[in-house]
């Protein structure tokens, strides 16, 4: 398996390597422990905290990202603006803002909570499982993305109609439609009825 930001270890303040840890949660989203990131995604999967971000431009178009080919999980597929996992004890909102900046080089000019959704999506291609309690966020992107190529292969702003066309032709992450559908009420509130979300 290639070393990517997701599978790499990080140096702690004393110089030793630390594995990336995730918060394990119960069905209500209450923290019950921690697990190493890759282990939490191996079948059958462990329910853990995650976040998904949906950013829109002033025309109501959604910013999509195609995940970098070097990602250990779902490489090369299209997905929402940003998704990831808070570190243990990190607020999902803070993690969402942090990772959006790390992956896309932009800070949302507005970021609002849009609810939560729980799902279990096996990925047949990798054998990994997304078993997540996902915190949803919607917001505005008023600057052009500057993606980190280790994380993001490409970006695109799309209307609802363009998304439907792209989704019919190109591969998307297993979780994409689940998180999009769960976030739609907040997306409609943000973008207005004319955007068609």
UniProtKB/Swiss-Prot annotation:
Task: Please write the reaction equations for the catalytic activity of this protein.
Answer: isopentenyl diphosphate = dimethylallyl diphosphate
- This protein's source sits in the domain of life called Bacteria
Q: Which UniProt keywords apply?
A: Cytoplasm, Isomerase, Isoprene biosynthesis, Magnesium, Manganese, Metal-binding
Task: Name where it mostly resides.
Answer: cytoplasm
The top EC class is: isomerase
* Cofactor (UniProt): Mg(2+); Mn(2+)
One GO molecular-function entry: metal ion binding
Q: Which Gene3D superfamilies does this UniProt record tie to the protein?
A: Nucleoside Triphosphate Pyrophosphohydrolase
User: Per UniProt, where does Mn(2+) bind?
Assistant: 41, 48, 85, 130, 132
Query: Do you know which InterPro entries this protein is assigned to?
Result: Idi_bact, IsopentenylPP_isomerase_typ1, NUDIX_hydrolase-like_dom_sf, NUDIX_hydrolase_dom
The keyword Isomerase belongs to this UniProt entry's keyword annotation: yes
Q: Kindly list the positions annotated as binding Mg(2+).
A: 103
Q: How is the cofactor bound?
A: Binds 1 Mg(2+) ion per subunit. The magnesium ion binds only when substrate is bound. Binds 1 Mn(2+) ion per subunit.
One GO biological process this protein is involved in is: isopentenyl diphosphate biosynthetic process
The residues responsible for catalysis, as annotated, are 83, 132
Pfam families tied to this protein: NUDIX (PF00293)
Q: Which family does it belong to?
A: Belongs to the IPP isomerase type 1 family.
HAMAP family, per this entry?
Idi
PANTHER family per UniProt = ISOPENTENYL-DIPHOSPHATE DELTA-ISOMERASE
Q: What does this protein do?
A: Catalyzes the 1,3-allylic rearrangement of the homoallylic substrate isopentenyl (IPP) to its highly electrophilic allylic isomer, dimethylallyl diphosphate (DMAPP).
What is the protein named?
A: Isopentenyl-diphosphate Delta-isomerase
């Amino acid at each position: 398996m290639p070393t990517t930001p997701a599978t790499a270890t990080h140096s702690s303040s004393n110089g030793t390597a630390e594995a990336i840890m995730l918060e394990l949660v119960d069905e209500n989203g209450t923290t019950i422990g921690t697990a190493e990131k890759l282990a939490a995604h191996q079948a059958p999967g462990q329910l853990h905290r995650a976040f998904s971000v949906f950013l829109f431009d002033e025309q109501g178009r959604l910013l999509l990202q195609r995940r970098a080919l070097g990602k250990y999980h779902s490489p090369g597929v299209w997905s929402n603006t940003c998704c990831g996992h808070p570190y243990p004890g990190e607020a999902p909102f803070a993690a969402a803002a942090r990772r959006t900046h790390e992956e896309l080089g932009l800070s949302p000019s507005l970021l609002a909570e849009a609810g939560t959704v729980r799902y279990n999506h096996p990925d047949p291609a990798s054998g990994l499982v997304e078993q997540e309690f996902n915190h949803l966020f919607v917001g505005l992107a008023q600057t052009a993305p500057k993606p980190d190529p280790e994380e993001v292969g490409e970006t695109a702003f799309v209307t609802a109609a363009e998304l439907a066309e792209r989704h019919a032709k190109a591969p998307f992450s297993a979780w994409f439609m689940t998180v999009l559908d769960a976030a739609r009420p907040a997306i409609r509130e943000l973008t207005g009825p004319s955007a068609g979300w």
